[in-house]
C-alpha cells in the first residue's frame, strides 16, 4: 500500500477485511521505509498467509527499492497529493514515484487504484496487471454511494459494478477520506475472495493505528 495520504488507515482496514478469511500480518504503525518494511517481513510466521505492508517514500526510486524487498501480488495506491512536493518538485514527479509500485506487476497480479484521483487513475496505463478501481466515480469497480458521515462515523453503500452486488457499510470512522480507504479495503478483500458482507462486518469493528 502506498499513497500521499491514507496509507496507514487503508493498511489497517485491508488487514481487517482479509483477517476474516486469512492469517494476516501487517505493518505496525507506519513503519514503511527501508528499515521498517524488513521488520514487518521478519514478523511473518510459517502459518502467515498474507502480509499487508505499507510503503513510504522520500524520492524517486525508493518505492521500487522497497518492492525489491517485498515482492507484491497486489499493489494499492490511495492517492497522489502535495505531500513531498518540497522533495520532488511537482505532482507529476510524486505520481511517478508512487507509480513505481505498479510498474513491475505482471498480468497475474492486481493493481488497486483510486478512480477519483487523476494521477492514480492514470497508473492503469503504466502496468500490465489486472486493474481494479474504487471511489465515487461512476466507472469505479467498487463504488461508494449514499455516503453519510457524522461525528460518530460513516455509513455508505458499496456497489460491485461487475456483479451489481451491493452492501451497506456502517463503520466508526469519520470523513469521506475514510470511506475511500474502506472502499480500497473492500476491493482488496474481493480480490482475495472475501465477500462484501464479510468486509463490511470487519470494518464495523476494525481498529486504526492511533485510534
Residue ranges and their predicted role:
Residues 116-117, 160:
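Heptad-repeat coiled-coil segments of the DHp/HisKA dimerization-phosphoacceptor module
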Residues 91-92, 125, 129-211:
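Adenine nucleotide phosphate-binding catalytic loops in nucleotide-utilizing enzymes
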Residues 1-115, 121-127, 165, 183, ...:
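Phosphate-binding loop of NTP-binding sites
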